[in-house]
Regions:
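Conserved catalytic core of the tyrosine transesterase superfamily
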Residues: 1-211
Length: 211
């Protein structure tokens, strides 16, 4: 929810925030904002090369998407300021990755997912328990789910055709099959029923489908 995200940002922006010697406060401030504002998977974010980010036109080139799907991901200037600031303060001559490990090379997912779940979420007052008893509960991948739901809601609020919104969002997220987006968004609300029913047809008509 918006309230939970505000608490998460409050935690990572706090001067009292402390992580291990490999991961600075600025790293988490920038990474979590990137994931929340773009819907990137954690692995995609950590795979980003400095050269994959166009700081002038505010576009990210994702070359390591799931299923070898490449795509362009635009971002707002407000996020761009964080990315530029991080790059200026953290990048060193010879670095390849945008989030280069202090020891060189790509950072590992595990420590980051653990810190988010065991450190940041509890400090934000967010329960680690699953809401339905079946899923794994909130984790860093939940930021992608939150982005997707917010994006669809915003498109509908702006008066855009909801029948076309889902397939375009599917492409933005790097899905090759709209059913992945349907499951991912958990469209169980009554107002989205028609979107699911016509989603396959729209995906084939507008984007040509694929799996």
């Amino acid at each position: 929810s918006d309230a939970e995200m505000k608490r998460i940002f409050s935690v990572i922006d706090s001067r009292e925030s402390a992580y291990d010697r490999y991961d600075s406060r600025l790293f988490y401030q920038t990474l979590i904002r990137l994931l929340y504002c773009t819907g990137l998977r954690l692995g995609e974010a950590l795979e980003l090369k400095i050269s994959d980010i166009d700081f002038t036109d505010n576009i990210i080139i994702v070359n390591s998407g799931k299923g070898n799907v490449s795509r362009l991901v635009p971002f707002k200037a407000s996020l761009g300021k964080w990315l530029i600031n991080y790059n200026r303060k953290k990048s060193k001559p010879g670095d390849t990755y945008f989030f280069e490990s202090p020891s060189g090379g790509r950072r590992c997912n595990h420590g980051i997912t653990t810190t988010f779940r065991k450190n940041i979420l509890p400090k934000a007052g967010i329960s680690l328990a699953s809401a339905n008893g079946h899923s794994r509960g909130p984790c860093i991948h939940s930021l992608r789910h939150t982005f997707a739901c917010n994006a669809l809601d915003q498109m509908i609020k702006e008066g855009k055709d909801p029948y076309c919104a889902l397939p375009y969002l599917s492409v933005y997220l790097g899905h090759t099959d709209i059913t992945n987006t349907e499951i991912y968004l958990r469209l169980t609300m009554e107002r989205y029923d028609e979107v699911i029913n016509v989603g396959h047809y729209i995906y084939e008509r507008v984007l040509g489908g694929g799996s």
